[in-house]
Amino acid sequence: MENQAHTTAGASPCEAELQELMEQIDIMVSNKKLDWERKMRALETRLDLRDQELANAQTCLDQKGQEVGLLRQKLDSLEKCNLVMTQNYEGQLQTLKAQFSKLTSNFEKLRLHQMKQNQIHRKESSSKEELPFELSSLNQKLEEFRAKSREWDKQEVLYQTHLVSLDAQQKLLSEKCSQFQKQAQNYQTQLNGKKQCAEDSSSEIPRLVCESDPGCEATQRDEFIIEKLKSAVSEIALSRNKLQDENQKLLQELKMYQRQCQAMEAGLSEVKSELQSRDDLLRIIEMERLHLHRELLRMGEVQTAQDNRKRVESSYSPSPKEAERKRKELFPMVSDQPNHEKELSKMRSQLYQEEGLCSEQERLRSEISELTQELHQKEVTIATVMKKAALLERQLKIELEIKERMLAKQQVSDRRYKAVRTENTHLKGMMGDLDPARYLAVDLSNKKHSQCTSINKLEYENERLRSDLAKLHGNGKAAWPNQSSYGEAGAYVFQSQLKTETSGDRISQDCELNRSPTPLSPLPFQTKEMASPLVGDNEVLALSPPDISFRASLAAQHFLMEEERRAKELEKLLNTHIDELQRHTEFTLNKYTKLKQSRHI
């Protein structure tokens, strides 16, 4: 117990020391963390400041680049102007030289001519008075030419001074461009230096971290924190780059949208101008239409007034006798004129009223005649429409009756076909039940006779069905213009008839041979299909009864297979014909309903 107490007493101060050490370590670590955080913040602030400086330097570079571009444009424009000016100056110089050469040649000619004239005038005394006048004119011309040459010299001097000034401007601009380029290079070097400083600061971070606490390099926690800080710094830088890229993209998109808006505004302005021009044209056209309408109304009023005047004149013109009679009657009553003036005015008013009533009656008669003509035309059109409708109804009824008859015939043919099919199936069953031993029985002739009769019945029924089909096809050709399908059906019927004729000949031969008195003779089975041309009569007679029965069963099966195939083909043809008839009936019914609806409308 004492040993245990001693060990616990010895362990307790160690634990206390360890705890103190741990606390001191924690304090140191916290202090280091605080120092690192401060340093990281200081570094981040420095990085932000350097980024701002870089951005400012970049903006300055962009501005300088824009200024350089403007100066280059100015240089190009000045060079173009200089070239144009030099070309103009050279052209003017050439023209001046040409004019000067012409003037010199003319002057020499004039001088020679003057010398000749002087010689002539010296010889002649009469022409001495004219010499001073000509000399004065020549002197005036010389003075004019000298003035022009002085002006040309002045222009030449001005052009030369202008060229010198342009050269000086070009030199100044080239010097400015070189200065701007040097400034741009300086800014670029400054930017590169700042970038290198930033890289050095980012590389100094781990070095400072390592120098701050060389004793805690092995601690994983501090390394993890440092890595986190580095990753955070890199993420911040990446996010800034991304934001800058996004801002550039947004600026480009804004510029693009602004251009599109400008284009749309230009298009809208063009459309508005076009609409305004069209509105103006429409207004002008409307004004012209109104003016023409007014003129037409005025012309109509004038024409109606002229017509009324002509009618009044025509109404008064055919009654001169009555006017004379009235005058004769009124002549003796001149004394009673003041009394009869009122009566005359009343009579005139009555006459005017009667004329107005007559004109109205004529107008009403003309309107009534026009209305009667229109009614008559409408009645005629209604009668024609009713006749057409009645004819269409009759045609539709006839077509419906024909279709009903064809459907009835089709149903009858279907029934017959079903009966023939049942008989064929029954015959198949009978032929399947045949055995070689039963085939050699005594009642073989009766069975064969019954088979022949049933086969004859089937052939007769098939021929009748073919004739019905031919009739139906003929009716279908009359109703439908599609001839290609019916031609194929006719060809198929002709082929089937040929096949039935060949099979009928074969079966008739079998039946005639079956009616012979010997029931077990091998002759009924010597058909064209079974007997080969290389086999003789003795070989056929030497055949055994099982071989004969086997060959007979094969022939019957072959015949039944052909009949089934023909029946299927006939069924297909009938189905197609029924479908065509149904389509035609639907078409006619739709046509009839449309005609009824149009007539009701």
From Swiss-Prot:
The coiled-coil regions, if any, are 14-59, 86-196, 226-277, 354-397, 555-586
- Known PANTHER family for this protein? DEUTEROSOME ASSEMBLY PROTEIN 1, SARCOMA ANTIGEN NY-SAR-24/CYTOSKELETAL PROTEIN SOJO
Could you tell me which cysteines form disulfide bridges?
none
Expression (tissue specificity): Highly enriched in multicilia-abundant tissues (trachea and oviduct).
Cellular component per GO, a single term: deuterosome
Region Disordered, as annotated, extends over: 305-329
The entry's family comment says:
Belongs to the CEP63 family.
Q: What else is known?
A: CEP63 and DEUP1 paralogs are both involved in centriole amplification: while CEP63 mediates mother-centriole-dependent centriole duplication, DEUP1 mediates de novo centriole amplification in multiciliated cells.
Species lineage, top-down?
Eukaryota, Metazoa, Chordata, Craniata, Vertebrata
Q: What is this protein called?
A: Deuterosome assembly protein 1
Identify residues that carry Phosphoserine. S544
Annotated localization: Cytoplasm
* Subunit structure comment from the entry: Interacts with CEP152; the interaction is mutually exclusive with CEP63.
Q: What broad class describes the main subcellular location of this protein? A: cytoplasm
Gene Ontology terms, MF aspect: identical protein binding
Q: Which biological processes are named by the entry's GO terms?
A: cell projection organization; de novo centriole assembly involved in multi-ciliated epithelial cell differentiation; multi-ciliated epithelial cell differentiation
Role: Key structural component of the deuterosome, a structure that promotes de novo centriole amplification in multiciliated cells. Deuterosome-mediated centriole amplification occurs in terminally differentiated multiciliated cells and can generate more than 100 centrioles. Probably sufficient for the specification and formation of the deuterosome inner core. Interacts with CEP152 and recruits PLK4 to activate centriole biogenesis.
Pfam families, from UniProt?
A: CEP63
Classification via InterPro entries: Cep63/Deup1_N (IPR031470)
Q: Which UniProt keywords apply?
A: Cilium biogenesis/degradation, Coiled coil, Cytoplasm, Phosphoprotein
